[in-house]
């Protein structure tokens, strides 16, 4: 059994900014500059669909696996010596279109998670194929579960059944529902006894929808460790595993959690 208290601290950077609508190259240039401002960190988190904005034009915008954004992320991760993650529109090997989070490591390996819950109010379920499985990544011994935007509303999918240390959400969450974002994120940390980090965008997209940001990091009691508000920029925070280990030892509610199976 691993000793969570002995894990090193984890320094993460949240990149909250505007997105150029359907302009991959402009977004590459913008994010390359912002990633350079993060300094020495372990993990850099970008918004959902960070190369295009939240778009249903998957037919024209989807890029292949190992396409330009895979290559760009590999280069940026190597340059920053950090994991870089965010979601993009991908055409999978089976031809389906996915809202796919890419997890680019500095050694060149890329892992991924496909968004499970597609936002039907925008017709996302008509243009994309949902993911079939939960995913957990490891970084410096930390167990990290990635999720994308609308996934936040479904607590069973976020449920920590694998001793997750950090729930990581990347999003294009509109300002009209910012109250829900700010209420649900601390709930996920409290119910799962883990840290939560969430990145949203700011500005207005090509369809006229406004985004309020509110990127944030919360601890296992739902307490705020970082809040970006509506600002555009790069925000860093250090997570301490020893604090999480101590809290779980004092309040092991996870031992009484109900068992379940996902179908």
Task: Report the location of each language-model feature.
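N-terminal glycine-/serine-/threonine-rich phosphate-binding loop
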Residues: 1-43
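Beta-strand-turn-beta hairpins that frame and shape the catalytic cleft
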Residues: 2-12, 136-145, 166
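Cys-nucleophile CN-hydrolase/nitrilase-fold catalytic domain and related Cys-dependent amidase chemistry
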Residues: 24, 32-109, 174-188, 194
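Short hydrophobic-aromatic micro-motifs
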Residues: 44-45, 143-148, 168-170, 197
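Short beta->alpha transition motifs characteristic of CBS
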Residues: 52, 102, 113-119, 216, ...
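CN hydrolase (nitrilase-like) catalytic-core segments centered on the catalytic cysteine
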Residues: 68-85, 153-235
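Short beta-strand scaffold segments in enzyme catalytic cores
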Residues: 86-88, 100-103, 135-137, 215-217, ...
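Active-site catalytic loop in hydrolytic enzyme cores
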Residues: 92-162, 176-183, 246-253, 263
